[in-house]
A protein has these predicted regions:
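Beta-strand-rich modules
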Residues: 428-449
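Metal-dependent peptidase/peptidase-like ectodomains
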Residues: 195-306, 314, 318
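A non-catalytic alpha/beta surface segment that caps or lines the substrate-entry region
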Residues: 55-132
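Conserved aromatic anchor
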Residues: 387-398
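Extracellular fibronectin type III
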Residues: 445-471
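Active-site-adjacent mobile loop/cap segments within catalytic or ligand-binding domains
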Residues: 64, 228-246, 295-373
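Alpha-helical metal-binding/catalytic segments enriched in His/Glu/Asp
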Residues: 129, 143-149, 153-202, 362
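N-terminal capping segment at the start of a domain
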Residues: 32-80, 330, 338-339
Length: 471
């Protein structure tokens, strides 16, 4: 009996047939012999294996030693509480800066807050390391994690709250990324920020987003790392090869007019944040073959939030990086043992080899983005009532060429692409505009490629006018 091909097999066949059918008919305008292709980068391969498990462990052990890091805890003691933890992280950044000849500036932006989880006016302070870019210093790539910790009662500021995974793991990763990237060249500015106030209401993310706006930063991406060190799920799954990257589908700052345009022209799954997530997936595929990025089409886990949200609300692209399988007995728990189950966020729940791989993903992503040009702006397409599609964009500084990408409208990742040289448009012959999504990336002379920018406001990496004018 002859078997019937599965739907998946048929889909793969369809894609292969389409690719063979389409490739011979592609004609691009203006590229000649000047096309620049993205290149495999040996320096990124070296970075991928550089994170130190020993460094990560030392940072987490030190943060745990402060007992609790609740935002509401002691700020005066040198041995216990959020104040001591902040000062230690600041000293660690300063030591890294000393080792690179002062290449890193350390700042501590803060604001006073009261709220549902902050009953009395409290200073929320972030500790931020800034490595200025050599070519495009106003363009900024940010890595964040939150320094504060909690137990079952979020208002309990005195009980021990080790917060080894939530989120000393994220802080350890960004400190290690700062150490490694302090020794590397970067055209765009790199920012590594240990935030406070996350557990009380994402206040530290707001402090940093407001600081970025006040400084005139052009934030290309915030990579928010929160709960990234555990490989043992509560459901019994052991998986040290998967990391989740959450990203919003439509921009948080989208206006009614922009939403109306998007509904008819597409862009529901192509915010700049979503294309940052796709970029991270490609980075992992190319440089970290033992780590799979699982893209999740949500801003965050169901009903939950993280410090990427204030960035999104400020109009900046941002994603959340989180372990593949969470264990809720180790999150937001009083330290205790019940019915043979050990509750609490202790260091025993951290897989340091896994944490090193997730740290590498962030480090390589930041390095690659910072060396590539900014994504193209002004991307637009035309081709209604035609069999060809024309893609337009504005040239950007530092780009030696551009690459046009397209994919089936139901495909999660870009499927096809072609280098088109140093031009501002391309005509794709025999590719009907109705059936595909399109985007454009920029490529440097030495082969570093930017994330893909989707056409229109829906996919633009530029901060939206609605966010700029927001009071």
């Amino acid at each position: 009996m002859v078997g019937i091909p599965s739907l998946r097999v048929l889909a793969v066949r369809r894609i292969l047939l389409l690719s063979f059918a389409l490739l011979p008919t592609l004609v691009f305008a203006g590229h000649g012999d000047t096309s620049v292709e993205p290149l495999e980068q040996p320096s990124l391969h070296a970075l991928a294996s550089a994170p130190s498990e020993a460094e990560l462990r030392a940072t987490i052990e030190k943060l745990i030693s402060f007992g609790t890091r609740s935002t509401l805890s002691d700020t005066k003691s040198d041995t216990r509480g959020i104040g001591a933890a902040r000062r230690w992280v600041k000293s660690r950044f300063e030591a890294i800066s000393h080792d690179c000849g002062g290449c890193i500036e350390v700042v501590t932006p803060s604001q006073m807050f009261t709220g549902k989880r902050i009953p009395q006016s409290t200073e929320v302070m972030d500790v931020v390391a800034i490595k200025r870019g050599s070519g495009d210093p106003k363009r900024v790539i940010v890595m964040t994690g939150h320094l504060d910790s909690r137990v079952t009662d979020v208002m309990n500021a005195t009980s021990d709250a080790p917060g080894a995974n939530d989120d000393a793991s994220g802080v350890a990763a960004l400190v290690e990324a700062a150490r490694l990237l302090s020794k590397q060249d970067n055209s765009a500015t790199l920012v590594f920020a240990a935030l406070s106030g996350e557990e009380q209401g994402l206040y530290g993310g707001k402090v940093l987003a407001d600081y970025a706006t006040a400084q005139g930063w052009q934030v290309q991406a915030d990579l928010n790392n929160d709960i990234i060190g555990n490989s043992h799920g509560q459901n019994g799954v052991l998986d040290n090869t998967t990391v989740r990257v959450f990203s919003e589908g439509t921009r948080s700052t989208e206006t009614d007019e922009q939403a109306k345009y998007r509904r008819y022209h597409g862009g529901e799954v192509d915010s700049p944040s979503r294309n940052v997530a796709r970029y991270m997936e490609q980075v992992a595929e190319q440089y970290l073959p033992d780590l799979r990025v699982h893209m999740v089409y949500r801003t965050d886990r169901y009903g939950r939030g993280g410090d990427q949200v204030p960035f999104l609300e400020a109009g900046y692209p941002a994603v959340r990086v989180t372990e593949g399988h969470e264990d809720y007995t180790r999150q937001h728990q009083d330290l205790r043992t019940e019915k043979g189950i050990h509750y609490g966020d202790t260091i025993e729940g951290v897989d340091f080899r896994y944490l090193a791989r997730v740290t590498a993903l962030n480090t390589v992503t930041m390095a690659a983005m910072s060396r590539a040009p900014v994504p193209p702006s002004g991307v637009d397409i035309e081709g209604a009532l035609a069999t060809d599609t024309t893609v337009h964009w504005k040239k950007v500084p530092g780009a030696a060429g551009y690459r046009v990408h397209w994919r089936d409208t139901t495909a999660p990742q870009w499927q096809f692409s072609r280098a088109v040289g140093d031009t501002d448009h391309a005509v794709i012959k025999d590719v009907v505009i109705d059936d595909w999504f399109f985007g454009v990336s920029s490529v440097s002379a030495d082969g570093y490629e930017s994330p893909v920018a989707f056409p229109g406001d829906a996919g633009s990496f530029q901060r939206s006018a609605s966010a700029v004018t927001k009071p």
